[in-house]
């Protein structure tokens, strides 16, 4: 329906979580020893859903989806400051919310996200033979929050980094490098789709 409305014809449809995994190979290359023989937890937290995918040597060994995302922070902003959802989302992205926002809303949200990541990992540990992960890689819209990697690392006691699939790519002069860097973690799915191999029709 969306493609039709845009005047486009959908030829191929992909699954969001699989598209993110396609880009994950670029992240693995940035890890010590290319992530070889390491247990890696990819946490993709978007507006409403958080996906945990655990991989070892490029193979998925666990996946879990739970309801959590940046939309909850936006809802908190709408209630706290009497904004519409659109105003709250725009203010959140622009970083022009009233004084006290960080202490009252942002920091508690970050702690809550870290707790959700920790819980998701506990589910992984109790349902597999694994009892640790070597790295947590944060992706999705929530990963652009400054300092979220440190909060998650403190809660989980696991080395945590922000996904940047473009880290080792040559960027065109027409692309705003600063904006790309700021949004890189939220572009994992888009990057994965761009890397997709197309079979001839």
Where are these regions (language model features)?
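Hydrophobic/aromatic-enriched cytosolic interaction surfaces used to assemble or bind macromolecules
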Residues: 1-201
